[in-house]
């Protein structure tokens, strides 16, 4: 039997993990929760903005995530730690973090998701730079994409289970 004392921490785990994803790809957390919202797969009484569940919003977020992943392989792609990149990671991961927790905890979930994304950007950037020097930009980008996509999908898919814990 699970203790109710740990329930808030378990629920915030999804926001934290999605923030880790957001530190690597800004648009993936938003796309993951928008798709989950459109499929009605988010936890009951979640903190997601209602507009997020609209199929057009989900499709748009997915298109932006795909565009970001394609652009990341370009030599001219900016580092994730530039100011606009950090701001985008904070905002999209905050929306995702709020969407993965009960409505009454949405502000905490937003803070956890957004702040984690900004913090995770730096070690993610350093790891990518180190890997790129050995393996190149495109191969390391594809590996990072696979990890990010798998993580985001697993988090969004299991958030409802965490909320029902």
What are these regions (language model features)?
Residues 1-165:
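Short amphipathic, positively biased membrane-proximal segments
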């Amino acid at each position: 039997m699970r203790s109710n004392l740990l329930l808030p921490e378990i629920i915030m785990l999804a926001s934290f993990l999605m923030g880790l994803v957001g530190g690597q790809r800004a648009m993936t957390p938003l796309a993951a929760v928008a798709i989950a919202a459109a499929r009605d797969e988010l936890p009951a009484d979640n903190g997601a903005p209602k507009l997020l569940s609209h199929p057009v919003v989900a499709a748009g977020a997915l298109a932006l995530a795909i565009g970001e992943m394609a652009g990341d392989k370009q030599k001219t792609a900016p580092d994730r730690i530039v100011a606009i990149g950090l701001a985008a990671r904070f905002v999209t991961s905050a929306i995702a973090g709020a969407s993965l927790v009960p409505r009454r905890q949405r502000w905490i979930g937003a803070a956890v998701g957004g702040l984690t994304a900004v913090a995770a950007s730096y070690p993610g950037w350093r790891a990518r730079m180190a890997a790129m020097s050995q393996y190149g930009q495109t191969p390391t980008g594809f590996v990072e994409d696979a990890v990010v996509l798998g993580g985001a999908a697993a988090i969004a898919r299991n958030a409802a289970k965490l909320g029902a814990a």
